[in-house]
């Protein structure tokens, strides 16, 4: 078995970024937090997730996140699967977050993109089929 354990995001402000992910994942919790040093720079860090996966947030970021419409090397986006995209959108809307980019709706999936407060593009996808071949078809 192989699965993703965590994503480590460097942000400027942990509480602001955490609020977005708390709205998206109300069942997740702060697993641990503390202070440390990252290559000579002090930082606060926090792990937010469940017993199996989490987001690591650190507040020692400098500069701006990658321009998503550009062609720079770096993270374009990451995605989470949900079994109810409409409920996800409603939670984020109620918390004051707007859709950054509408996704596709086809026979086998629907998705949507948000920008978190740190500027990372986050995709949420709901699959409408249990068949992996259908899920992975290109539109």
Mark where each language-model region is.
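N-terminal beta-strand motif that seeds the catalytic metal site of vicinal oxygen chelate
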Residues: 1-18, 75-80, 130-139
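Residues that flank catalytic or metal-binding motifs in active/ligand-binding sites
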Residues: 3, 42, 51-53, 71-76, ...
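Core segments of cupin and vicinal oxygen chelate
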Residues: 8-53
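A short, acidic/glycine-rich surface segment
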Residues: 30-32, 40, 62-67, 132-133
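Vicinal oxygen chelate
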Residues: 31-34, 89-139
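Short, charged/polar surface micro-motifs in flexible loops or helix N-caps
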Residues: 50-54, 61-63, 85
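Residue-level recognition of conserved beta-strand positions in structured domain cores
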Residues: 57-59, 126
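Mid-chain, well-packed structural core segment of small domains
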Residues: 71-74, 78-92
């Amino acid at each position: 078995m192989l699965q993703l354990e965590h994503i480590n995001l460097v942000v400027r402000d942990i509480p602001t970024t955490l609020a977005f992910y708390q709205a998206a994942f109300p069942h997740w919790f702060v697993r641990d937090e503390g202070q440390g040093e990252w290559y000579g720079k002090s930082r606060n860090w926090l792990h937010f997730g469940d017993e199996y996966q989490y987001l690591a947030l650190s507040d020692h970021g400098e500069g701006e996140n990658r321009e998503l419409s550009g062609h720079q090397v770096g993270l374009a986006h990451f995605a989470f699967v949900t079994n109810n995209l409409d409920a996800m959108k409603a939670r984020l809307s109620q918390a004051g977050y707007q859709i950054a980019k509408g996704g596709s709706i086809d026979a086998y999936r629907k998705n949507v993109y948000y920008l978190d407060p740190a500027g990372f593009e986050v995709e949420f996808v709901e699959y409408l089929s249990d068949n992996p071949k259908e899920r992975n078809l290109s539109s």
